[in-house]
Amino acid sequence: MRVLIDTNVLADVLLGRDPYYDIAYSILTMCADKKVYGYMAAHSIPNLFYILRKSMTKEERREVLKDICQIVKVEGIDSFKIISALDNVDFDDFEDCLQEECAVAVSADYIVTRNAKDFVSSRIPAILPEQFLEKYKDIMQT
């Protein structure tokens, strides 16, 4: 199974945000253990680098993001994906549209996000982290 993990779920882990941390961490563990193939959109990296600025030094941010890149694969954004996202009028948020473009490119089964409502017109179904874990908890056992 392939999942694209949205920036907000990654931020939950990196910032230790309650009450989301445990669930997000479990999903990353599934990726690290190769029980699920995890992906993130390339533009999530500069977004996370910025989001983490108040809680980590620049060096800490670099290291933690390199660690994340060892767990999930980074899907790049090229001009084709950008133009396709710009042409897509079904999304209110351009960044979400780019997430969807990356999910399509990696043939993801789901976009794991805390903002599933923002992906109602997505070609790839969005699922909340807790719903994903509930649905696929048997994967954790193997």
What is the meaning of each model-derived region?
Residues 1-39, 53-60, 121, 135-142:
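Short, well-structured N-terminal submotif of metal-dependent ribonuclease cores
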Residues 9, 47-48, 84:
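A general alpha-helix detector
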Residues 40-41, 113:
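Short beta-strand segments at enzyme active-site cores
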Residues 73-116:
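Active-site neighborhoods of divalent-metal-dependent phosphate/nucleic-acid chemistry enzymes
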Residues 25, 45-73, 78-80:
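Active-site-proximal, substrate-binding regions of enzyme catalytic domains
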